[in-house]
């Protein structure tokens, strides 16, 4: 038991040291790059709810490399590197692969895990839950309900009212402020 604790302590210390390093710019896109990436993606829509089915080759052509790696290859971005980790504007978070609404900003909280965390999805159908037994762990993977992009995982150690912690890779999230979302809603309605 003592040996296990020593190994765990060393591993945690090494992880903390590597996580504190600055992230590479390749993981972050400025808003201009993100907008042009959205324009190249024919399935990206914040209003269309139809299911998206594409081959991996098609996804590879339309998604930025960092989004493709996490969304389609079930990768994980480095903790504490997401621009949404310490981001608290009011609005809605969307799937970066297809534009599906995922979370309201009111459900975001600081879990200390290094990734954006939420306690409740925007709707029941916005997230798909899949058993994940990789890496010697038993977890529940979260996928986008529209395009099945890998988002992250959900754990049962979150705050009230749900007790859930949706630990999401920020690179697979897009964000629109409440004002932007309201404007698009009004334009769509007219």
Q: For each predicted feature, which ranges?
A:
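Low-complexity, intrinsically disordered short peptide segments enriched in small/polar/basic residues
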Residues: 4-7, 49, 124
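A short Gly-Trp-Pro
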Residues: 51, 60-94, 100-190
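Polybasic, lysine/arginine-rich low-complexity segments
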Residues: 28, 34-35, 189
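Bacterial Sec-dependent N-terminal signal peptides
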Residues: 1-31
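Acidic, low-complexity intrinsically disordered regions
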Residues: 10-13, 55, 76, 111
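Short hydrophobic/aromatic-rich motifs at helix boundaries and adjacent loops
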Residues: 27-30, 40, 136
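Short, contiguous pre-domain boundary segments
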Residues: 34-55
């Amino acid at each position: 038991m003592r040996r296990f604790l020593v190994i765990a302590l060393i591993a945690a210390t090494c992880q903390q040291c590597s996580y504190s390093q600055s992230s590479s710019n390749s993981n972050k896109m400025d808003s201009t790059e993100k907008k042009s990436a959205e324009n190249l993606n024919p399935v990206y829509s914040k209003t269309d709810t139809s299911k998206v089915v594409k081959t991996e080759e098609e996804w590879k052509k339309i998604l930025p490399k960092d989004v493709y790696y996490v969304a389609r290859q079930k990768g994980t971005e480095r903790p504490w590197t997401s621009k949404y980790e310490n981001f608290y504007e009011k609005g809605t978070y969307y799937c970066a692969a297809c534009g599906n609404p995922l979370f309201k900003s009111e459900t975001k909280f600081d879990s200390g895990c290094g990734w954006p965390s939420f306690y409740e999805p925007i709707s029941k159908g916005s997230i798909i839950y899949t058993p994940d037994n990789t890496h010697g762990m038993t977890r529940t993977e979260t996928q986008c309900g529209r395009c099945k992009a890998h988002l992250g995982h959900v754990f049962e150690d979150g705050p009230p009212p749900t007790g859930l912690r949706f630990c999401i890779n920020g690179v697979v999230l897009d964000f629109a402020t409440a004002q932007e979302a309201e404007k698009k809603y009004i334009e769509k309605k007219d």
